[in-house]
């Protein structure tokens, strides 16, 4: 992973968890070839462990094949919530939790 290729290492992305793609606004240029071109997604794997889906891949410079960052995305269902996480030097860090119920109990207003 290369901190010289990104504007900010592991930026806080709130609840934006990317299963695929790249956060190009954070990409400065490749530190090895000094070009700012497309970022390839390579070495993508998808595994499932104990009900948790884990997707990993590398962000790579199109021109010189320098590895810019390693991306990890996880998805799981815990109780009545879908849990998402993302950790990547380029795309950032994020967490999200979405209720599987029609009405999210956390969003309901108290009656009294």
Curated annotation (Swiss-Prot):
InterPro entries: Churchill_sf, Transcrpt_activator_Churchill. Zn(2+) 3 binds at residues 59, 71, 88, 91. GO terms for biological process: positive regulation of DNA-templated transcription. Zn(2+) 2 binds at residues 30, 33, 61, 64. Gene3D superfamilies: Transcription activator, Churchill (2.60.40.4240). Zn(2+) 1 binds at residues 2, 5, 30, 66. Belongs to the Churchill family. This is Protein Churchill. The lineage of its organism: Eukaryota, Metazoa, Chordata, Craniata, Vertebrata.
């Amino acid at each position: 992973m290369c901190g010289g290729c990104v504007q900010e290492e592991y930026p806080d992305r709130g609840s934006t968890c990317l299963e695929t793609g790249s956060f190009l606004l954070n990409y400065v240029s490749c530190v090895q070839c000094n070009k700012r071109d497309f970022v390839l997604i390579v070495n993508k794997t998808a595994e499932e462990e104990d009900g948790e889906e884990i997707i990993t891949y590398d962000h790579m410079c199109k021109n010189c094949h320098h590895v810019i960052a390693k991306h990890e995305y996880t998805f799981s269902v815990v109780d009545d919530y879908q849990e998402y996480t993302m950790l990547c030097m380029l795309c950032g860090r994020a967490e999200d939790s979405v209720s599987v119920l029609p009405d999210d109990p956390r969003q309901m207003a108290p009656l009294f």
